[in-house]
Amino acid sequence: MGLTGTMLVLVSLAFFGSAAAHNCQNGTRPASEQDREGCDYYCWNAETKSWDQFFFGNGEKCFYNSGDHGTCQNGECHLTNNSGGPNETDDYTPAPTEKPKQKKKKTKKTKKPKRKSKKDQEKNL
């Protein structure tokens, strides 16, 4: 095995060793990630010199720092408690409201024609 082969083995061991040290694989929650909110976490990839994203398994309990709790499903934390905001289980039917009370309309009395005064009656005769 030449120098290239040896380097490949060492790099592979370093990569797998760093991933194994953090137990980085989809579907698991490493002990180092117990306080991680949501359903994903990142592990350093020494080979690519970047962070790789991993996801907790379906059914894994998840939480947000706001205090909301849920269950992981396809890499997303689906909330199981109601925080007061909308979520996929909320029904968007508005709360019933009372019908405003209508004021009773006063019935208008028909005005009787004014009676002519005695003076006016005498003039017309």
From Swiss-Prot:
Tissue: Salivary gland (at protein level). Saliva (at protein level).
One Pfam match: TSGP1
InterPro entries: Ixonnexin-like (IPR011694)
Location of the protein in the cell: Secreted
Ranges of biased composition (kind: Polar residues): 75-86
CDD domains: TSLPI_Salp14_NTD (cd23501)
GO CC terms: extracellular region
Induction line: Induced in salivary glands by blood feeding.
Summary of the knockout phenotype: RNAi-mediated knockdown results in impaired feeding of adult ticks, observed as decline in the engorgement weights. Decreased ability of salivary gland extracts from adult ticks to inhibit host clotting in vitro; when silenced together with Salp9Pac. No significant effects on the ability of nymphs to feed.
The name this protein goes by in its record: Anticoagulant salivary protein 14
Gene name for this UniProt entry: Salp14
